[in-house]
């Protein structure tokens, strides 16, 4: 815990200023739905006009999906001590199926609240927790199966459909290659009804706890944009609440669609409260981590009662999805004995140790329906954990991994009987040629429930670069149908990530997710690529920077070679210089063609441009004949 944490939390909590700066040449816009309180945020990037040398035309702004929440809206006053503005309380209250609780249901949460020693750490503006009324189910899946389109579903449809609407407006920029979606059912237009139907059949989830009203609704499913998750959390080795909140705001700025708080150090409860109250994206946790802390790290001392209290504690704080390692069965544990790296999942190893110590079946498995009752009372989504995932490519796709996956498929069907939203976690370390088998088996065993994978890492030889080894696998499995990709930072296997590592991991995974969207043929996915390519050809440097995923780094790299402001309007690039710039030469060819009576006809993407003569060929040939005679009719001449 940082030495100044008492002062920070109780008196002077301030948002990290680097997280609230608007992106260059961008503005926050809101698209309104069928009711005034459905206001969907997007980031609009303004572009310069095409220079007259290139035809001189106006370039429309480009809108991009925005996960940064109110932090990048200059009209919103951010105060971490009071949390983010409420988005969903009115929708939740209108449904009339929840009730405010007079006190917390968790014994542990009550003890923390009544401990005066924690006053300086505690978030001061605690929300009154809500729970489903007796006999009610408040999950988005339950509403969807009743045929109800919730405001959350309409909000998501507007958000996901953004690129398609732009495509209709953008003319030439709407050109897009056909995709290969491997059986996914991506529609031409995403409507609220389509969102409802996907949630109803279990192919998508909307992680949105009723106790997280600050949330801006989003969706995870193979027929929607590929999402990414960023991990934060303290450990026994260090970090403070201040640092974790800063990682949250920093991560969502750069594109994290969800955040998992994996804290295992001190004050887990208080850290999580600060994170949720200041999060506009869904927050996930692994409850077994905190339950283990409650028994001083002794796995065999874990009990169902302790775990149940932990679930309720976190659900009433507003956690949107839980990783539950219910598929680590006693009979699977011996299958890992001959592995190169054994069991590498922290949650998986905890439950394996408990099973062996008691020689009983995993209590998360035997109490699974009890867990479902808790989940549907708060609308917490399952993220069924892959506790037996491979920790090396040598162990990929083995009997232990696939046995657990089959069990997760069985548990998914039970969760769906309770109308509880469910996604499935996946590997891990898998070489490229074995990735598709993972995706195909998951779709088959789990009824197309969303898949959520950690990478996978495609090779084990690059410590310090595992954001790259895993980004390769992430792009591939995203293309094959994975719905959400859990980022990996350069510090994977080496240490706790700092802010810079978080950003690098997120940008790497935004690239992977976007590449997958392009490959699947998601409607409108190519607009941003086309806009940036057009800016590059027209030497609109500022537009190139601003259309990129990381404008700051792009600008900094350009400045290293061409630091002067005049270079930002130069008609050559920093790589080749003025004489060898291929794009400059191409423009000169076009200018020459126009000047000499030829026309270059653009073809479809991937085809060569066609040069059509617009003059009398015989006259031109006669002109060359006259030149030859005038020079003495010599075949060879000295140069």
Swiss-Prot record:
GO molecular function terms attached to this record: 4 iron, 4 sulfur cluster binding; carbon-carbon lyase activity; zinc ion binding
Query: Would you say which domain of life the source belongs to?
Result: Bacteria
Q: How is the cofactor bound?
A: Binds 1 [4Fe-4S] cluster per subunit. The cluster is coordinated with 3 cysteines and an exchangeable S-adenosyl-L-methionine.
UniProt gene name: thiC
GO BP terms, alphabetized: thiamine biosynthetic process; thiamine diphosphate biosynthetic process
User: What's this protein's name?
Assistant: Phosphomethylpyrimidine synthase
Q: Which organism is it from?
A: Teredinibacter turnerae (strain ATCC 39867 / T7901)
Supply the alphabetized keyword list.
Answer: 4Fe-4S, Iron, Iron-sulfur, Lyase, Metal-binding, S-adenosyl-L-methionine, Thiamine biosynthesis, Zinc
Cofactor(s) listed in the protein's UniProt record: [4Fe-4S] cluster
Under the subunit heading, UniProt states: Homodimer.
Q: Which residues are recorded as binding Zn(2+)?
A: 429, 493
Q: What does this protein do?
A: Catalyzes the synthesis of the hydroxymethylpyrimidine phosphate (HMP-P) moiety of thiamine from aminoimidazole ribotide (AIR) in a radical S-adenosyl-L-methionine (SAM)-dependent reaction.
Q: Is Aminoacyl-tRNA synthetase there in the keyword field?
A: no
Question: Which family is annotated?
Answer: Belongs to the ThiC family.
Which InterPro entries does the protein's record reference? ThiC, ThiC-associated_dom, ThiC/Bza_core_dom, ThiC/BzaA/B
Describe which pathway this protein belongs to, using the record's wording. Cofactor biosynthesis; thiamine diphosphate biosynthesis
Listed binding positions for substrate are: 231, 260, 289, 325, 345-347, 386-389, 425, 452
| Database matches in Gene3D superfamilies | 6.10.250.620, Radical SAM ThiC family, central domain
| Residues at which [4Fe-4S] cluster binds | 573, 576, 581
Give me the reactions it catalyses.
5-amino-1-(5-phospho-beta-D-ribosyl)imidazole + S-adenosyl-L-methionine = 4-amino-2-methyl-5-(phosphooxymethyl)pyrimidine + CO + 5'-deoxyadenosine + formate + L-methionine + 3 H(+)
Supply the EC number(s): 4.1.99.17
Of the GO CC terms on this record, one is: cytosol
Region Disordered, as annotated, extends over 49-71
